[in-house]
A protein has these predicted regions:
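Bacterial lipoprotein signal-peptidase II cleavage site
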Residues: 18-31
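Extracytoplasmic "Venus flytrap"
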Residues: 50-76, 81, 92-101, 192-196, ...
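An alpha-beta-alpha
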Residues: 56, 74, 164-210, 306, ...
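Structural motif
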Residues: 88-112, 218-233
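Beta-alpha junction/loop-to-helix N-cap segments that form part of ligand/metal-binding clefts
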Residues: 93-153, 245-260, 264-269
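Hydrophobic alpha-helical segments within soluble ligand-binding/sensing domains
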Residues: 148-155, 160-184, 284-305
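Pocket-lining segment of extracytoplasmic ligand-binding domains
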Residues: 194-270
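Hinge/cleft segment of the Venus flytrap/periplasmic-binding protein
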Residues: 299-358
C-alpha cells in the first residue's frame, strides 16, 4: 500500500467509482472552500438497476502520514467490499486543514448533499461532522479517535467508528527500559488536542508513581512546537513523550534533528512519527484500523446493521517502530535497544526517515 504525505492548502476532492452491493443521487460538488479534483481510483463498469450505489464523504482533519495511511486503507478495503458484496460506491475526499471553521463548512456541505455515510478521520473532524449531522440519521463512522468518550462521540444513535486509544504505560516503560534510572521526562503535546488529554494524564500518573519528574511544553502550530522542543532541550531532558497528537505529528519533520543534536530520544504514539524522524513510534496498526473502519461502513450500508449494533472498536497496542538512523545518531546499540523493548511490545519494526510510507 502506498501512503502519501502532503500539506494541503485546499480541500481535496476525488471521485472514485468502484464496482460493488435502491440508488441515491450523486451529491452536488459545491463547497464553501477551494477544492481540487484528483484522478479516479478505478473505473467501474456500468451500473445495473439491481446494483446499489452509495456516495461517501471522507473528511480528513489534516494531511500527515498517519491520517493519509488510514484514508487509503479505508478506500482499499471498501473497494474489496464493493467487489465482494456487489455494490457501487463513490467517494469525495475533503481536507479540513486542521481548521475548525473549514471543518464546519465541510460538515454543512456534506450533510446538505445527503451523503449515504460520512467517514471523518481524527477527533476534531469527527466532532465537527457529528455537530453538523445533529438531527439527521446520516451514519457517521469515524476513524482514529483516541478517546471517543472525552470527544463526546459515544451514545449517539447514528455514530460509531474506530479508536486508536494508546497504551501510555507501555510507552513509558519503553523509555525507562532504554534509560534505567531516568529521573526526568519531557512531555510535548498540543493542549487543544483531545487525542492527547488522557494519554498525558496517564503519563503524568506513571511518572508520579515511579518518582520521575516531568517537564511539559506545548504548541498549537509548527512554529510553536519548534520553540517547545527547543525549550525541552534547554531544560536538559533526555527523553520526550508525545501521544497521538496531530499537531506534533505535523511538526515532527521540523524538530527531530534538533532532538538528535541534543541527544534527546523522542517516544511517540504512532509509527508515522518514527517515519518522520522520531526515535520510536508505538501504537496501533493504522492499516488495520482503516480496514476495520471500512468494514463497519459496509456492514451499515449493505448488511442492515446500525451504529448501535457496532460499538466503537479499539485495537491491541504493541507495535514498536524504531527509526534506525535516529537511534544510531543518538549512539544507541540497535540490538540492545530491541532487547530492552521486547517485554513491552508484540512486534518491533524498523524504518528510515522519510515524508511518507512507500
Amino acid at each position: 500500500m502506498k501512503k502519501f504525505f502532503a500539506v494541503a492548502a485546499s480541500l481535496i476532492l476525488s471521485a472514485a467509482m468502484l464496482t460493488a452491493c435502491g440508488s441515491s443521487a450523486a451529491p452536488a460538488a459545491t463547497t464553501g472552500a477551494p477544492e481540487t479534483t484528483a484522478a479516479a481510483v478505478t473505473q467501474a463498469p456500468e451500473t445495473t438497476e439491481e446494483t446499489k450505489s452509495f456516495h461517501i464523504a471522507i473528511v480528513q482533519q489534516l494531511d500527515h502520514a498517519s491520517l493519509d495511511e488510514i484514508r487509503l486503507a479505508v478506500e482499499d478495503e471498501l473497494t474489496k467490499a464493493a467487489a465482494d458484496k456487489g455494490f457501487q460506491v463513490s467517494y469525495k475526499e475533503f481536507n479540513g486543514q486542521n481548521d475548525n471553521t473549514v471543518l464546519n463548512q465541510i460538515g454543512a456541505q456534506v450533510v446538505s448533499d445527503k451523503y449515504d455515510a460520512i467517514i471523518p478521520i481524527a477527533s476534531l473532524a469527527a466532532q465537527c461532522m457529528v455537530t453538523a449531522a445533529d438531527g439527521t440519521n446520516t451514519p457517521i463512522i469515524y476513524a482514529a479517535v483516541s478517546d471517543p468518550a472525552t470527544a463526546g462521540l459515544t451514545d449517539i444513535p447514528n455514530v460509531t467508528g474506530t479508536s486508536d486509544a494508546l497504551n501510555t504505560d507501555a510507552i513509558m516503560n519503553l523509555i525507562v527500559a532504554a534509560n534505567p534510572g531516568i529521573d526526568t521526562i519531557g512531555l510535548l503535546y498540543d493542549l487543544s488536542q483531545d487525542s492527547s488529554t488522557q494519554a498525558i494524564a496517564d503519563a503524568k500518573a506513571f511518572c508520579e508513581k515511579n518518582g520521575i519528574k516531568v517537564v511539559e511544553k506545548n504548541g498549537t502550530t509548527t512554529a510553536e512546537v519548534q520553540m517547545a522542543a527547543e525549550a525541552l532541550v534547554a531544560a536538559g531532558v533526555k527523553a520526550v513523550f508525545t501521544p497521538t497528537d496531530n499537531t506534533i505529528m505535523t511538526a515532527e519533520l521540523s524538530i527531530y534533528e534538533s532532538f538528535i543534536e541534543a541527544g534527546v530520544q523522542h517516544y511517540t504514539g504512532a509509527d508515522s512519527f518514527a517515519l518522520n524522524g522520531a526515535m520510536v513510534g508505538y501504537g496501533v496498526d493504522y492499516v488495520q484500523l482503516g480496514e476495520a473502519t471500512a468494514d463497519m461502513v459496509s456492514q451499515l450500508l449493505c448488511d442492515g446493521k446500525t451504529p448501535a449494533d457496532l460499538p466503537y472498536q479499539t485495537f491491541d497496542n504493541g507495535i514498536v517502530t524504531i527509526t534506525t538512523e535516529t537511534a544510531e545518531a543518538l549512539g544507541l546499540d540497535l540490538a540492545a535497544l530491541k532487547e530492552a523493548f521486547k517485554p513491552y511490545c508484540t512486534e518491533i519494526t524498523e524504518v528510515t526517515t522519510a515524508e511518507n510510507f512507500s
